[in-house]
């Protein structure tokens, strides 16, 4: 499995699950019943698909916005037109990532990996794409691999756990069983290259603490150095983050920034958002 955990582990390891009203099974069941006939739920600038999306709406609405100034959040809510598309690889942690994005004032839409085609994603004209964690291997991830290959050259992509493995495999790497075995809620120090990793890890201590829920990694021996560069590692040298050499807006992490075991996780999401914003400014300047 790419990400080894259960829904109960997600609740224990995530600040989103810990404080969300959706943690009440009765309240969640009631919300699901009211919206059972509605395929799409939209609220407060974010849109999600299916019953699992109800919890995301509740959690995002309830979350605090302490990671970024209120003015920045309000500006995003007022000015963003294009969504960030979240490809959900059927993982219980996906909506904890969505909560962070909601707290940062982002407009996003969530779709399971078999709900859309690449053409559907193109028509949505997203400003960025987040590829979520998930069970299995990259080949089991619906459109995730194809998204990296076809849309990565033009659209910023952030892969988490399975998402990083999709990036690795898309560009020629081999995904293997982790030498240290299954990581299930393990806390590990992660060290990053302060030059190559500054886009995602700016402002973080080096090393920082990260939550790991995975049994697969990108193999070091077949790492595609011609296309990608590793940006962060565990103490025993396992690759914990990477980016594309040419398309530096393709980035991913093996650990879980959305877990409470990763204290700086929201900052990592914020850094990716700011990277998108800077890229948009750069592209706008090139057009003028």
UniProtKB/Swiss-Prot annotation:
Active-site residues from the entry: 161 (nucleophile), 256, 258
Record's keyword terms, sorted: Amino-acid biosynthesis, Aromatic amino acid biosynthesis, Chloroplast, Glutamine amidotransferase, Lyase, Plastid, Transit peptide, Tryptophan biosynthesis
A GO MF term: anthranilate synthase activity
Domain of life, per lineage: Eukaryota
Major location (coarse): plastid
Tissue expression summary: Expressed in roots and leaves.
Residues that coordinate or bind L-glutamine: 134-136, 165, 215-216
UniProt-listed PROSITE patterns: GATASE_TYPE_1
Compartment annotation: Plastid, Chloroplast
Keyword hit for Transit peptide: yes
Any GO BP: L-tryptophan biosynthetic process
Reactions it catalyzes: chorismate + L-glutamine = anthranilate + pyruvate + L-glutamate + H(+)
Induction profile: By the phytopathogenic fungus Bipolaris oryzae.
Domain Glutamine amidotransferase type-1 residue range list: 83-282
Protein name: Anthranilate synthase beta subunit 1, chloroplastic
